[in-house]
UniProtKB/Swiss-Prot annotation:
Residues 43-320 form the ZP domain. Keywords: Cytoplasmic vesicle, Disulfide bond, Extracellular matrix, Glycoprotein, Membrane, Pyrrolidone carboxylic acid, Secreted, Signal, Transmembrane, Transmembrane helix. Residues 1-19 form the signal peptide. Disulfide bonds join C44-C155, C79-C104, C235-C296, C255-C313. This is Zona pellucida-like domain-containing protein 1. It comes from the Eukaryota.
Amino acid sequence: MEQICLIILLISKALSVGAQFNGYNCDANFHSRFPAERDISVYCGVQTITLKINFCPVLFSGYTDTDLALNGRHGDAHCRGFINNNTFPTVVLFSISLATLETCGNALVVSTAQGPNAYGNLSLVQIGNISGYIDTPDPPTIISYLPGLLYKFSCSYPLEYLVNNTQLASSAAAISVKDSNGTFVSTLSLLLYNDSSYVQQLSIPMAGLTLKTRVFAAVKATNLDRRWNVLMDYCYTTASGNPNDELRYDLFFSCDKDPQTTVFENGKSQMGRFAFEVFRFVKHKNQKMSTVFLHCVTKLCRADDCPMLMPICGSRKKRDVSERTESNSASGNAIITAGPIITRSDDTPMNNSQLAQLNSPVFRMNTVTSALISGIIILGVMSLCFFILSLTLLKGKRAPPTILSGARNPAFN
C-alpha cells in the first residue's frame, strides 16, 4: 500500500512539474527556482545586440514570454522577444538593431576614453555605451505574490560603429488615411541633410558636430496623390531616443519657435522642411560629447484644408474653425525620429596634433619664478654692456703716442 501511495505521489509531482513548464525544454531539478543574473546572455554584435534569457525560471516565477519587454515597453509588440525551444534550456531571444536604437527606448551615452584609434596610435577615442533592461509589468493590484523580474544589459562600441559617416538612423511611421476612394497607407520618414539643397544626407564626423552647426531636416511622405500634403504639428529634441522622455526641448510648437530654428515649408507640399542649430544638453556637462534625437509629430492633411490647420497666431477665431474641420480633413498623428546627432564641446580634440597636446604635460611658472628669470636676464644684459664698455676704455689707454712728421724749423733752435 505504501508503494502504491509513493508511485501516485511521484506521478502527481511529475504531472505538476510538466504542467508548470508547459512542455518547454526545462529540467525541474535545475530550473525550479527564481531567475538570477546568470540567466541572461548578452552578445554585442557589429550590427545587432542579441539577448538570450533562460525562459525556465521565468515560467517557474509565474510569467510567460509576453510578460517580458524591453525598457518597460509592454504595449509594443516590437519590443518583445520570441521563444526558441530548439535549445536546452528554452530561451527568449531579443534582437536590437544598432541602426534603430531608439525604437524601444534604449539609452545611448557617448564618453571619451584613452585607447588606440583607427591608425593604431594611442589617443582619445569616443565610446558609445548602449544600455537598457528587460522587465515584467507591474500588477494592477496593490500587492503581488509574484516577484518582479529585471534583467539589465549594456554594450560598448567605438563611435564609428554607431554613427556612420555617411548616414544616420531614422525611423519611419505608417499612417492610415481614409478618403472618398477608400483607405490607403502612407509612410512618413524624417531625414537630416548637410545643407539647404536637401541632397546630401547629414555626415557626422567621429569627433561629433561643433555646437551651432546648422542641420537641415525634412519630413517626407510616400504613396500620396496631389490631394494630400505633409503637416508638421511640432518638432522637439530629447537626449535619448525615447520620444516620451521628460527631458525635451521644443524646436517649434504652435506659435512658439526656437530663435535658431527656421521653418521653410510646412503644409504646402508632400514634404516639410526646417533647419536648426545643434546644441548640447546641460545634463551632459561632464561628457565631451552630447547626443540629440530629433522627433516630429506629423500628420497628413488635404491640400485645400492645410492652411486652416496651420496655427494662426493672434487670431483665435480662425483656429477654432480649423479645429472643427480637422477630423474630416486630416489623418491621425505619427511620431517619427532621427538620430542620434552627436555634438562635441569646444575643447574636444579634432586631430592628432591636438590629441598630442592634450596628452603632453603642461608646464606653468608661478610669479616668483618668472620674476627671478626676468631679473637674471636683465642682469646678464647689463653685465654684457659693462664688459663691452670696459674693453673699449682699455683699448683707448693702450693706444701708441702720435709721431709728428715734417721739416725742422731752425727758428726754434
